[in-house]
């Protein structure tokens, strides 16, 4: 059976060799070529028609971001995974690449001198992403069971009775494809009458840059969450990389709690942790949305939300980069609605508006 055909793009001959050897060792993957910069990658993508491209960001002649833009400008939708350095500069460049149309990213090998451990870390991060982004040849990247038509909006279980007093909290979980999906969703929402807490699987530095970027773009506050921070209506708090984000409550209202408890679902922050804490804090008055992402993080938490009378929405398969997390929720019958990405915002507004008298009053954000 043919493998997933991958093109490796990097200006370092050492990295090209290491990544090619690592991928070729997997029986489901075939490295069909390499390229030394973004310009050469354009030619190789057209010639070789790979199933997926791995792309360095910093390269001579044409860097990875320019190459992604050029590939997308031709209408080619081949999945592209960026190699990113875990630095402030690398975080900014990676977000730029995702905005240009890259599908995902993995940390670049930081210490070629420690080849064994470094490449094992790359293998653990890269190969599952490749197999999730190229769903073919018997490889199943999302749960089997529920099949959603490409343009369908699906109701999978009876809607929960609206909580008395309305929803008090919106929680969102996302992973692969999540930065662009979350940005698109938030751009459809005005300042809300409830606080928003988000877990996006990202490393440290990346979440801070991501929150800052959204804060510049949106007409309300988006912050990287800090410990014991008030969660106020009309604001969005994003979990910092390597910390679980929990919601707590006291006499003054809702607050954040950050912990470095063990990872759940191999993730820290984990969506399940956020969802579980939301139920503990507000009971049935929680509204959750599960966006594109690899794996099933959020499914256990979604079940708790539903069992307590809260509501869960999921992004549909057609608009997800990877229908793992939302697919797990849909397959388990936990989502009240499975919707295209750009229909989630209006659905959230509809649910908040029917249970609350209004959105945030004028001046409430000052």
From Swiss-Prot:
* InterPro entries, per the entry: CheB-like, CheB_C, CheY-like_superfamily, Sig_transdc_resp-reg_Me-estase, Sig_transdc_resp-reg_receiver
Q: Which UniProt keywords apply?
A: Chemotaxis, Cytoplasm, Hydrolase, Phosphoprotein
**Under which EC number(s) is this enzyme classified?**
3.1.1.61, 3.5.1.44
Name the Pfam families on file.
CheB_methylest, Response_reg
Compartmental location: Cytoplasm
Q: Which GO terms describe its biological process?
A: chemotaxis
Q: Name one GO molecular function term.
A: phosphorelay response regulator activity
> What does the record say about PTM?
Phosphorylated by CheA. Phosphorylation of the N-terminal regulatory domain activates the methylesterase activity.
Q: Which residues form the Response regulatory domain?
A: 5-123
Domain CheB-type methylesterase intervals: 163-355
- Where's the active site on this chain? 175, 201, 297
Listed GO CC annotations: cytoplasm
* Keyword match Phosphoprotein: yes
Give the modified residues of type 4-aspartylphosphate: 56
SMART domains per the UniProt record, alphabetical:
REC
Top EC class, one word: hydrolase
Reactions catalysed: [protein]-L-glutamate 5-O-methyl ester + H2O = L-glutamyl-[protein] + methanol + H(+); L-glutaminyl-[protein] + H2O = L-glutamyl-[protein] + NH4(+)
Give a short account of what the protein does.
Answer: Involved in chemotaxis. Part of a chemotaxis signal transduction system that modulates chemotaxis in response to various stimuli. Catalyzes the demethylation of specific methylglutamate residues introduced into the chemoreceptors (methyl-accepting chemotaxis proteins or MCP) by CheR. Also mediates the irreversible deamidation of specific glutamine residues to glutamic acid.
Per the record, what about its domains?
Contains a C-terminal catalytic domain, and an N-terminal region which modulates catalytic activity.
Family statement: Belongs to the CheB family.
- Recorded protein name is Protein-glutamate methylesterase/protein-glutamine glutaminase
């Amino acid at each position: 059976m043919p493998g997933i055909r991958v093109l490796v793009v990097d200006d370092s001959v050492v990295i090209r060799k290491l990544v090619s050897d690592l991928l070729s060792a997997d029986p489901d993957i075939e490295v069909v070529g390499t390229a030394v910069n973004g310009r050469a990658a354009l030619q190789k993508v057209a010639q070789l028609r790979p199933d997926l491209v791995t792309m360095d960001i910093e390269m001579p002649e044409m860097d990875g971001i320019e190459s992604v833009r050029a590939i997308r400008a031709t209408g080619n939708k081949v999945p592209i995974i960026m190699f990113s350095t875990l630095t402030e500069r690398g975080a900014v460049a990676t977000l730029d690449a995702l905005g240009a149309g890259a599908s995902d990213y993995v940390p670049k090998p930081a210490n070629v001198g420690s080849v064994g451990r470094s490449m094992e870390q790359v293998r653990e991060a890269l190969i599952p992403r490749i197999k999730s982004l190229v769903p073919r040849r018997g490889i199943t990247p999302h749960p089997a069971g529920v099949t959603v038509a490409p343009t369908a909006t699906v109701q999978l279980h009876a809607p929960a009775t609206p909580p008395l007093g309305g929803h008090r909290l919106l929680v969102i979980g996302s992973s692969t494809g999540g930065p662009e999906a979350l940005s698109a969703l938030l751009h459809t929402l005005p300042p809300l009458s409830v606080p928003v807490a988000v877990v996006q699987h990202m490393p440290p530095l990346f979440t801070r840059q991501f929150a800052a970027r959204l804060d510049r773009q949106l007409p309300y506050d988006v912050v990287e969450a800090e410990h014991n921070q008030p969660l106020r209506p009309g604001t969005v708090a994003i979990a910092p990389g390597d910390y679980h984000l929990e919601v707590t409550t006291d006499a003054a209202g809702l607050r954040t709690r950050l912990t470095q408890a063990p990872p759940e679902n191999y993730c820290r922050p984990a969506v399940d942790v956020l969802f579980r804490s939301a139920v503990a804090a507000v009971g049935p008055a929680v509204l959750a949305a599960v966006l594109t992402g690899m794996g099933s993080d959020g499914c256990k938490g979604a079940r708790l939300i539903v069992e307590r009378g809260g509501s869960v929405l999921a992004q549909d398969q057609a608009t997800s980069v990877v229908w793992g997390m939302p697919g797990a929720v849909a397959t388990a019958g936990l989502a009240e609605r499975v919707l295209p990405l750009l229909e989630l915002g209006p659905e959230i507004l509809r649910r908040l508006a029917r249970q609350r008298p209004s959105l945030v009053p004028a001046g409430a954000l000052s």
